[in-house]
Regions:
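Phosphate-binding site recognition
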Residues: 1-169
Length: 169
């Protein structure tokens, strides 16, 4: 619902909110509806028992989000370097370092393309970490997730708002 509220789409999604409290909260809130590029990830299915399988699952999830923004591949606002990076992710030829910094890079590319900062929503961000703890690959997964989340959420000039939800208390 949060993604639907903020995300810029070709269809008018305001119809979903006209009978909700947020619509009655005033023009400041209405003005944000449907105005932002959104990165949305969920790690709800990241329940792998080995680091190799978890890494493949994380890459798959990241690649799917890049595919959701396929319009970037033909963007006149992106550099050849950006498009080469995009292609490496989409073609599954990226390195572990490329994937660790993928969300930071994707947010910068979306910001360039749309001319506005990005909203990032990550659901169950801690599921891969919990699985790493349970199955003995905690060091590998925590290093990956630290870089992935830090690249997009810390000191990112392309970030408008970041929302994380977790499963642990």
């Amino acid at each position: 619902m949060v993604r639907t509220f903020f995300e810029k789409t070709h269809t008018d999604t305001s119809i979903y909110f006209k009978d909700k409290y947020i619509w009655r909260a005033g023009a400041a809130y209405k003005g944000k509806q449907g105005q932002y590029p959104v990165i949305f990830l969920t790690f709800k299915d990241a329940h792998q028992s080995t680091w190799q399988d978890m890494y493949a699952s994380l890459c798959f999830t990241l690649r799917n989000e890049f595919l959701r923004h396929i319009e970037l591949t033909t963007s006149a606002r992106l550099s050849d370097y950006d498009k080469k990076y995009l292609k490496s992710i989409l073609d599954d030829e990226a390195t572990i370092i490329d994937y660790q910094f993928a969300l930071g890079k994707l947010s910068a590319m979306l910001s360039k393309h749309y001319g506005r900062n990005v909203i990032v929503i990550i659901d169950e961000y801690d599921t891969p970490i919990q699985q790493g703890h349970i199955f003995g690959y905690y060091d590998e997964v925590i290093g990956f997730m630290r870089n992935l989340l830090s690249a997009v959420l810390k000191d990112n000039p392309s970030l408008e708002l970041g929302i994380l939800t977790g499963i642990l208390r």
